[in-house]
Amino acid sequence: MTASYLPSIFVPLVGLVFPAITMASLFIYIEQDEIV
């Protein structure tokens, strides 16, 4: 049982999920800042 396939899963996952969370949190922060 080798873990050689893990980088091919984690690299796109980190490259897509982290920017998505960052953009979503920034969008929510800006929206809340405009409402208040």
From Swiss-Prot:
DNA repair among keywords: no
Keyword Transmembrane helix: yes
GO CC annotations on file: chloroplast thylakoid membrane; photosystem I
Membrane spanning stretches: 7-29
HAMAP family, per the entry: PSI_PsaI
Function: May help in the organization of the PsaL subunit.
Family label: Belongs to the PsaI family.
Protein name as catalogued: Photosystem I reaction center subunit VIII
Organism this protein belongs to: Psilotum nudum (Whisk fern)
